[in-house]
C-alpha cells in the first residue's frame, strides 16, 4: 500500500495513494480531500420530495447524493430531478443505486443513464448464475457508453453466495481452516476485486471505478478495508452499513471510520444513520463533516469549543450561549460559504468559569469566559488571543453574539478584502 503525506489542516497524516475518480466533477481519491456523501430515503418517483431532500442534503454540505433507482417510474423521474435541482442552483452529483434490474433500467431509460453522475452496482444481486456476468457487463458497458464511473458496492447482507460457498468449501479442505468470520471477510474482498477486474477487462478504466465493502460490525469493517487497501489502489468508499439509530450509530461509524481514516484509508465516506421517525436526514451529513473536521482532515464549519460544565458552573448561561452560536453557525453556513470565504476556519470558545475559561478563550479566534458559580458577574472577551473587553449585565449573551457577527464580517467579509 503506497502512501504520501497530505495535510488538510495543520495535521499531516499518511494518505493511501488511490486512483482519482471524477464523479460529476467531484474528485474522489487521488490527492483530493475525503468527500462527504449521503443518500435519500424518499421514493425517487416522487420528484417533489426527492428534489427537496437532495437540496437539503446539499445545503447541509453533502458533496455527492445517492438516490434509489429501483423501477421504471424511478428511472423516468431522474432527469426531471436533475433538471429541477439545477434550476434551484444545486449542481450536486447524483448517484443511481441499482439492484437486481439495473442493466434493464439503464437500457430502457437513456435519459436516466445520462443524468446520473455515477452508477452503483452490487455484485451480490446484479444477476444470478449464468446471467450474473452478462448483466454486470451490461451495466459496465452502459457506463463506458455514457462516460460514467461506477461504484462496485459489496454488502455482507447480499454477498455473492456462490463465491462464499466456494471459499467455505475450499477452507474446510485446508489442514488448518480459518474461522467462518475470516472466510466471510475474504469473500467480501474477493467479490469487490473480482468484479473490479472484470469491469476493467470489459474496458472500464480504473479511474472510473470506486470500491466499497460494507459490513455492520466495526472490527469487520476495519479488517475488510485494510485488506482492500493492501490489495488494490482503487478509490475506496467507506461506510458502516446498518449502523443503527442515534448515538449507537454515530459511535459505531465514527469508531470504525476514524481508525481507517487515521491510517490514510478512505476517499469518500457516508455515515449511514437510521433516522428517528420524522427525523432530519441531514444529520448524517453533519456527523460525517464533524468526524473529518474533528480529526483535522477538513474544515466545514467554524468550531465552537465549550466546557462540559462542573460544580463551578451551575448556571446554564454558557450552555445556552454555546448552543445558540452553534445553531446559528449551522443555519447560516450555506450563505456564509458564499459571503465569507474561509469562515469555516473560524474558532469560537464559550467557557463557563475562570479555571480554563480565559486560557481556552485566548486560543480561539474569539472567545468568552462566562462567570462560574460565585464569581464576579462579568465575562472577559478575547479576540485573536488578546482581551478586548469585559461584558456585564443581563445582555452578555446577546452582546457576545453581536461581537462574533462583527468579527466574521471584519475578518472574512468585503471590508477585509477592500482594506487589503
From Swiss-Prot:
Record InterPro entries: Dihydropteroate_synth-like_sf (IPR011005), IspG_bac (IPR016425), IspG_bac-typ (IPR004588), NO2/SO3_Rdtase_4Fe4S_sf (IPR045854)
Enzyme Commission identifier(s): 1.17.7.3
Keyword 4Fe-4S recorded: yes
Essential cofactor(s): [4Fe-4S] cluster
Chain residues that bind [4Fe-4S] cluster: 307, 310, 353, 360
Pfam families from the UniProt entry: GcpE (PF04551)
Keyword Endoplasmic reticulum: no
Signal sequence bounds: none
Pathway: Isoprenoid biosynthesis; isopentenyl diphosphate biosynthesis via DXP pathway; isopentenyl diphosphate from 1-deoxy-D-xylulose 5-phosphate: step 5/6
GO BP: any one term: isopentenyl diphosphate biosynthetic process, methylerythritol 4-phosphate pathway
UniProt catalytic activity: (2E)-4-hydroxy-3-methylbut-2-enyl diphosphate + oxidized [flavodoxin] + H2O + 2 H(+) = 2-C-methyl-D-erythritol 2,4-cyclic diphosphate + reduced [flavodoxin]
Cofactor binding: number and manner: Binds 1 [4Fe-4S] cluster.
Superkingdom as given in the UniProt entry: Bacteria
Keywords: 4Fe-4S, Iron, Iron-sulfur, Isoprene biosynthesis, Metal-binding, Oxidoreductase
GO molecular function, one term: 4-hydroxy-3-methylbut-2-en-1-yl diphosphate synthase activity (ferredoxin)
Similarity remark: Belongs to the IspG family.
Function: Converts 2C-methyl-D-erythritol 2,4-cyclodiphosphate (ME-2,4cPP) into 1-hydroxy-2-methyl-2-(E)-butenyl 4-diphosphate.
Protein name: 4-hydroxy-3-methylbut-2-en-1-yl diphosphate synthase (flavodoxin)
Organism: Brucella melitensis biotype 2 (strain ATCC 23457)
Organism phylogeny: Bacteria, Pseudomonadati, Pseudomonadota, Alphaproteobacteria, Hyphomicrobiales
